[in-house]
Amino acid sequence: MMRMVAAAAWACALAGPAAQAGDFDGSKALICAPARVHECDAGANCVAGSPREIGTPTFLRIDFEKKAVVGPQRSSPILHLEKSEGQLLLMGTELGFGWSLALNQETGDMAATLADRDGVFVMFGSCIAP
C-alpha cells in the first residue's frame, strides 16, 4: 500500500510542471516575485540585493486581459507583447523609464529590466498562475 501511495505521489510530481506549462502562455494572469535585484548607475558599479533592500516591488501581477503589469503602488500598461522561442516578451514605459520583462513559457522564470538615462534595475525571479 505504501508503495502505491509513493508511486502516486511521484506521478503527480512528474505531471505537475507539464500541467502548468500552459500557465505561462499569456492566457492567464500571473503573480511574479523578483528574488534578486541589481541596481546599476551609469559609470558606476552595480549593487545587488533583495527587492526590499533595493526598494523595488516584492510582487508584481501581470494581467494579460487588461494588458497591464500591476505593482503595489501603480499599474503600467503593456505596450508591446511578443511570443517567441519559448518566451513572452513584454515592454512598456512608466515614469520616464523603459521596461521589459522576459518570461520563460516552460518554467515561469522571469528576467526584467527598468532603465532610464541614469541607470538600470535588473530583476530575476519566478511567476505563478494564482
Enumerate the predicted regions with their spans.
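A mature extracytoplasmic/lumenal domain signature
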Residues: 34-36, 73, 94, 129
